[in-house]
């Protein structure tokens, strides 16, 4: 079978193709979660302050993800839709312009994080000078991962749009295993503490980026036969990448910014609340990281079929995807709720911190089912180039989240009020997206379009 046939998502059994496409992405998401949990575990041996410091810095790395997702989404949609239209040269132009922009912006962002880290961390109004110092140390090193993350995430999107998610999965897995192996060595054997955890992340990010550059230029099943890393900028392609990607990037940027506002509220309840929240979020990512991964696979799958005008195939894909993610969501929601105490106890030992963490997981568990099936609607909208719709729903609910969290935290609920505000707005956003998607797909034609080979 030719490379093109293997990666053509417009023909063949829908579930098999979608499952094979999505499984590596979801597995990568689970490995990233495992990696984050492993880092938290090792840092917890140094003390809860180290867990809290790493969690605070991570939120600035999330800010960089708003730009990463912007370029990745634009490149992935451009590649997927043009491969569906049988226009590989146009697909390559999106891939090249997206990658170049990502690396440039990633470098600028990293420099800004390093130079401004002291001022940026003051946002959280950290009372402990000790906690502020170790957070600054960690941030100075972790910021070096950003340009490489920009590059390798966009390449992953390019491969996804092409229909090959296996190779990025293998490379991501190798990088994550390397990071997991190096972290305890740098922390304990070389006695580098939290700086050691950051150095391990840098080494893994560089390793990941180098291997993916090799994959784009040398691997036998690469998306494009001839791929130049540096080309003349095509401003038309750049404009379209930004048109698709800016709504997604703005959504994540505002989400992270508003979440940092909520984190500042959490810091007012003390170091235990910060640590419990950070650990709880990592455990919770078993659902939202997988939902995000499935949404990414849906973007590529829907993108190719949308480009090919396969309307009947699109509708079947929606039904299959909702059933699959509903099953996963039901399982993970139950696990998080039932096993909250032992899960939190792996990372925290203080009874007060454990109690706060268990409260977080049990309140948030009810929304995880909806979050999982929401990923289907999100990926569908993005694959069809309608990136504005998920962004509108997300931004609106994130603004509402801040209002609810502050209002409920001021009551006798305390931190539980914050967790409740987060869960309620998660549910509202998911229901909004599912209803909007149901209404939107009714507008598609019933008969398939004809796309010439």
Report residues per predicted region.
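Transmembrane helical elements of multi-pass membrane transporters/channels
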Residues: 20-39, 141, 152, 204-208, ...
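Alpha-helical transmembrane segments of multipass membrane proteins
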Residues: 37-41, 154-158, 177-185, 213, ...
């Amino acid at each position: 079978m030719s490379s093109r046939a293997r990666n053509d998502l417009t023909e063949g059994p829908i579930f098999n193709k979608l499952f094979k496409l999505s499984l590596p992405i979801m597995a990568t998401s689970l490995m990233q979660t495992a990696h984050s949990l492993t880092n938290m575990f090792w840092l917890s041996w140094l003390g809860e302050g180290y867990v809290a410091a790493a969690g605070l810095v991570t939120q600035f790395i999330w800010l960089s993800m708003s730009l990463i997702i912007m370029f990745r989404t634009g490149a992935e949609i451009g590649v997927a839709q043009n491969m569906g239209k049988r226009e590989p040269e146009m697909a390559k132009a999106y891939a090249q312009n997206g990658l170049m922009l990502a690396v440039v912006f990633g470098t600028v962002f990293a420099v800004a994080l390093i130079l401004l880290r002291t001022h940026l961390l003051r946002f959280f109004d950290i009372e402990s000078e000790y906690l502020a110092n170790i957070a600054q140390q960690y941030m100075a090193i972790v910021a070096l991962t950003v340009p490489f993350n920009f590059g390798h995430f966009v390449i992953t999107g390019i491969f996804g749009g092409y229909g090959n998610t296996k190779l990025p999965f293998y490379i991501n897995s190798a990088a994550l295993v390397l990071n997991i192996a190096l972290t305890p060595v740098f922390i304990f054997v070389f006695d580098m503490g939290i700086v050691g955890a950051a150095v391990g992340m840098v080494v893994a990010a560089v390793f990941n980026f180098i291997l993916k550059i090799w994959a784009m230029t040398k691997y036998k099943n690469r998306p494009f036969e001839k791929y130049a890393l540096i080309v003349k900028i095509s401003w038309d392609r750049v404009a379209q990448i930004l048109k698709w990607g800016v709504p997604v990037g703005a959504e994540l940027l505002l989400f992270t910014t508003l979440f940092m506002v909520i984190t500042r509220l959490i810091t007012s309840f003390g170091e235990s609340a910060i640590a419990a929240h950070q650990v709880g979020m990592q455990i919770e990512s078993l659902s939202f990281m997988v939902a995000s991964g499935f949404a990414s696979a849906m973007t590529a799958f829907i993108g190719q079929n949308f480009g090919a005008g396969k309307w009947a195939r699109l509708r079947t894909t929606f039904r299959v995807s909702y059933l699959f993610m509903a099953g996963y969501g039901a399982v993970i929601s139950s696990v998080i709720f039932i096993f909250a105490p032992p899960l939190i106890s792996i990372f925290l030992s203080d009874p007060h911190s454990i109690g706060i963490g268990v409260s977080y997981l049990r309140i948030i568990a009810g929304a995880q089912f909806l979050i999982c099936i929401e990923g289907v609607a999100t990926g569908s909208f993005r694959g069809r180039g309608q990136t504005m719709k998920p962004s509108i729903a997300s931004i609106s609910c994130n603004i509402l989240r801040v209002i609810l969290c502050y209002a409920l935290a001021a009551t006798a609920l305390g931190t539980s009020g914050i967790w409740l505000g987060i869960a309620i707005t998660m549910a509202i956003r998911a229901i909004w997206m599912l209803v909007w998607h149901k209404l939107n797909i009714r507008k598609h034609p019933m008969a398939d379009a004809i796309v010439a080979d």
